[in-house]
């Protein structure tokens, strides 16, 4: 049995057991959700549609994700990690790290302009507790790595506080 940890609140973790038997169901659910969220939007997609199209039971869905917002958090983690990874691949290694941040921001802006339903996903991610907490923690780590050299007196936790403040603007 593999245990995954989902961040709910700072320093509080809820372990969810994922067995090798449930991994195919998880993949199907995520694939269906991406398709439905992009086609219909997050709010207009129901759990009933998801379980029907993913060919899983309600209990399987709930055991893996608890609720639709659990799927959103999983997708946020994937997107966040991939956006910074993409930004790193795009920027030249000789450029200052701040360019990675600029490119990642441009990627986010471009993605939200491409599709209204994708824009809705971003809005949901930043308003739901679990997803937004993941974003703030992960962004603080990235910002600390990028700007820590310019702000040597600040810790990663300071960057977390700055992220909370600037995210509310």
Regions found by a protein language model. Give the residues of each.
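N-terminal intrinsically disordered/low-complexity leader segments
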Residues: 1-21
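N-terminal positioning helix adjacent to the helix-turn-helix/winged-helix DNA-binding module
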Residues: 18, 25, 29-32
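Helix-turn-helix
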Residues: 28, 36-70, 74
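Hydrophobic alpha-helical connector segments
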Residues: 74, 85-118, 136-138
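CheY-like receiver
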Residues: 78-81
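Short linear capping/connector segments at secondary-structure termini
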Residues: 88, 121-128
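Amphipathic alpha-helical packing segments from all-alpha helical-bundle domains
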Residues: 126-169
């Amino acid at each position: 049995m593999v245990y995954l940890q989902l961040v709910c609140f700072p320093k509080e973790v809820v372990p969810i057991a994922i067995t090798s038997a449930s991994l195919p169901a998880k993949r199907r659910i995520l694939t269906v959700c991406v398709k439905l969220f992009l086609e219909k939007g997050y709010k207009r997609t129901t759990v009933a549609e998801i379980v029907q199209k993913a060919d899983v039971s309600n209990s399987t869905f709930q055991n893996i994700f608890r609720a639709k917002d659990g799927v959103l958090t999983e997708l946020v983690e994937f997107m966040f990690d991939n956006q910074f990874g993409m930004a790193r691949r795009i920027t030249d290694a000789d450029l200052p790290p701040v360019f990675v941040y600029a490119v990642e921001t441009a990627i986010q802006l471009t993605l939200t302009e491409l599709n209204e339903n994708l824009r809705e996903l971003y809005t949901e991610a930043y308003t739901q507790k679990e997803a937004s907490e993941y974003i703030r923690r992960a962004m603080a780590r990235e910002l600390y790595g990028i700007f820590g050299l310019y702000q040597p007196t600040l810790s990663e936790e300071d960057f977390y506080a700055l992220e909370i403040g600037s995210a509310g603007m």
